[in-house]
Swiss-Prot record:
Pathway: Aromatic compound metabolism; phenylpropanoid biosynthesis
Family in the record: Belongs to the zinc-containing alcohol dehydrogenase family.
Keyword NADP: yes
Chemical reaction(s) catalysed: (E)-cinnamyl alcohol + NADP(+) = (E)-cinnamaldehyde + NADPH + H(+); (E)-coniferol + NADP(+) = (E)-coniferaldehyde + NADPH + H(+); (E)-sinapyl alcohol + NADP(+) = (E)-sinapaldehyde + NADPH + H(+); (E)-4-coumaroyl alcohol + NADP(+) = (E)-4-coumaraldehyde + NADPH + H(+)
Keywords per UniProt: Lignin biosynthesis, Metal-binding, NADP, Oxidoreductase, Zinc
Protein name (record): Probable cinnamyl alcohol dehydrogenase 1
Species of the source: Pseudotsuga menziesii
Amino acid sequence: MGSLESERFVVDVAASNLDK
């Protein structure tokens, strides 16, 4: 159920980390 949300969160974090 929270798989999609978890993936979305991971992608958001990864994007933020890359932007840094």
